[in-house]
Amino acid sequence: MQAPSVHQHVAFTEEIGDLPDGSSYMIRVPENWNGVLIRDLDLVSGTSNSNAARYETMLKEGFAVAGTARHPLRQWQYDPAHEIENLNHVLDTFEENYGSPERVIQYGCSGGAHVSLAVAEDFSDRVDGSVALAAHTPVWIMNSFLDGWFSLQSLIGEYYVEAGHGPLSDLAITKLPNDGSSNSSGHGMEGDLPAAWRNAFTAANATPEGRARMALAFALGQWSPWLADNTPQPDLDDPEAIADSVYESAMRLAGSPGGEARIMFENAARGQQLSWNDDIDYADFWENSNPAMKSAVQELYDTAGLDLQSDIETVNSQPRIEASQYALDYWNTPGRNVIGDPEVPVLRLHMIGDYQIPYSLVQGYSDLISENNNDDLYRTAFVQSTGHCNFTAAESSAAIEVMMQRLDTGEWPSTEPDDLNAIAEASNTGTEARFMALDGWEIPEYNRTWKPE
C-alpha cells in the first residue's frame, strides 16, 4: 500500500506490506530523494520507537529508507540468512515501484548490524556499503558471554549458597528453558532464574572477596565494567569504582543469565548448544584481559587477601561445556557468521557500555580484517554510552556521511573522535555526539574469534 505522508516537516511516500513469510516491510521515499537507499532490518520498529529521530534525519537529508520488522517467531526461528533474503525481497519491491537506487547502503543495529556485516561479506552484489551499529556475531557473542557467566558461576556461587538462597544448581547459564519465562523478543527473562542470579550478585557484593571475584569474571569474559544505565563511567585507575560498576553491571545482566538472548540463539539450531569452553585455559584469558581491568582485579584481590591464581585455577577446574556440532554447522554458513572479508566498505560503531553485546567483539573482527588485508574497506568508531542501540540521530547521521564520503571519493575521511563529533554536530539534529577514543579500554586480542576452516 502506497500513500503520501508528512512527518516532522518531511514529505515522503510510504509503502507498507507483508512479505511471504509474514514479516512486515516498509518503504519511505522523500520528495527530495537523493537517489540513495538506506536498507535496514529494523526499519518498521525503528520508525516508531525511541530511535525514530535517526530515520527522520535520513529522510530530511534526502535518503530513502526501506526495511522490515523482525518476524514474531524470531525467538524460536532466528536465522540472519533468511532475514537477508527478506531484505532482498524488499529491495526488489523498491526497484519495481520507485526505480533502481543509485546506491544502496545496508544499515542496522544489533542483529541488524550483524546483517550489515554479513551482507558486506557474502551478499554484497546489491549494496555499495554497510554501516553496522552494535553488531553481534552469534557464536562469538555467546562464547564471550559463556566465559564471563561460567566464571561467575564458578567463583560466586558459594555466596548464594551460604546466604541460604538455594543450591548452586539454581544458577543455570546454558540449556535455558522455553517455558515462557523469556520475553517474546528473546531478550530478558522473568522468574526464578534471574532472581537467583540477582541474589547471588547481591550476596557476593557484600564482601571484598565477592567483589574481587565478580571483577575477575568480567575480565575473563572481556566484558566492559560499565554496563548499567544511569551510573557514572568508572575511573579505570580506581579499583573500588570499577568494583562498584561491575556490581551494577552484573545486576543489569541478571535479566539474561548465560548471555543476552541465549535462548534465542540456542533455539535457532533446534536447541543445540553453540558455545563451548572444553578447550579453554582461563589462565590464558586472564593474560589477555584489558590491562586496566587486570590492574584493578589484582588490587581488589590483594585488598581481599585472596590468591588470584588460585581462583583462576578454580575456574579452570570446573566441568566444561561442549558445543553441538549440529549447532556449529548451522552457524557456519553465509549470513550466519562473518570472517572479516567484506567486498564493500564497512563502518562499524559500538558503545563501550553496551550490555547486550560486549565491545570486545569489535577487536576480533578488526583483527580478521587486517589478517585478510582488508583495512582499506573498514573503519571503526566507539561511543561513550551504556545501553544498546541508543545511538543518537547525530551519531547515525555522521556514520552515513562518512560512508557517503568513502563511496564518493574512494577514500575514508578521518574517523578520529573529534572529527566524527564535528561531522555529527554539523548535521543539526539537536542531539548529542559522543564519539570517543578507547584510551585504556583496549584489549590485547579478542578471545573468541570463530573462523572455522
From Swiss-Prot:
Quaternary structure (record): Monomer.
Post-translational modification: The N-terminus is blocked.
Mechanisms controlling activity: Inhibited by iodoacetate, p-hydroxymercuric benzoate and copper ions.
EC number of the protein: 3.5.1.79
Highest taxon of the lineage: Bacteria
Keywords for this protein: Hydrolase
Organism: Xanthobacter agilis
Lineage: Bacteria, Pseudomonadati, Pseudomonadota, Alphaproteobacteria, Hyphomicrobiales
Swiss-Prot/TrEMBL catalytic activity: a phtalamide + H2O = phthalate + a primary amine
Function: Catalyzes the removal of the phthalyl group from phthalyl amides generating phthalate and an amine. The enzyme has a broad substrate specificity and hydrolyzes phthalylated amino acids, peptides, beta-lactams, aromatic and aliphatic amines; substitutions allowed on the phthalyl group include 6-F, 6-NH(2), 3-OH, and a nitrogen in the aromatic ring ortho to the carboxy group attached to the amine.
Practical use: The broad substrate acceptance, high catalytic activity, and stability at high salt or substrate concentration of the enzyme indicates that it can serve as a gentle method for deprotecting phthalimido and o-phthalyl protected amides in new chemo-enzymatic synthetic routes.
Temperature dependence: Optimum temperature is 28-34 degrees Celsius.
Covalent S-S links between cysteines: none
The protein's enzyme class: hydrolase
Activity response to pH changes: Optimum pH is 7.8-8.4.
GO MF assignments: phthalyl amidase activity
A family per Pfam: DUF6351
Gene3D superfamilies from the UniProt entry: alpha/beta hydrolase
Protein name: o-phthalyl amidase
